[in-house]
Amino acid sequence: MSDVVALDTKTSKPDVGVRDSQTVSSGGRLAVSPRIAGVRIVELGNVLTRSGLLLELFRDDWPDVGIKPRQVNWVCMNAGGVTDWHRHTRQTDHLVGVSGVIKLALWDGRPSSSTVNRTDVIRFGGVSPRLVIVPPGVWHALRNEGGEPAGYINVFDEPYDYANPDNWRLQPGTVGVPDIL
């Protein structure tokens, strides 16, 4: 079997293969919506100033957000670092990539969801900052895809409960976990 694609010499169209679907608009923004119900993406923009760079991370008047922040964490992932698959039952995560390149893998584990068992992958970071809203019940994991540390901010709508954590983890190698990370 050859990896070479034959071209029709009259039309320059390949005889085999699948056309890529649109992923970005002509303005450089994502052209696709999240594939999981309740997951939302807010495109953020770096603003160059005479003294450097400004990035708005969160505003309570953004129409796609609608929460009162109760806790904010900054996370620095080591080069190649990977988190466990995890989900929350009460907490909504609001993740903003601020440095590096981070791959966010999502898997809908909500039995009553219209998108149950659907997966999605969203990339974000310093070059392409986005706010990604992950609702309760959606399994998610993150991978630093770069060779340098990568950082993200997580804005919670529920404070972390030290005595009764709303964090449910899957052990590495758990059968049935999607291979998308």
Give the label of every model feature segment.
Residues 2-128, 145-181:
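Non-catalytic, conserved peripheral segments adjacent to functional cores
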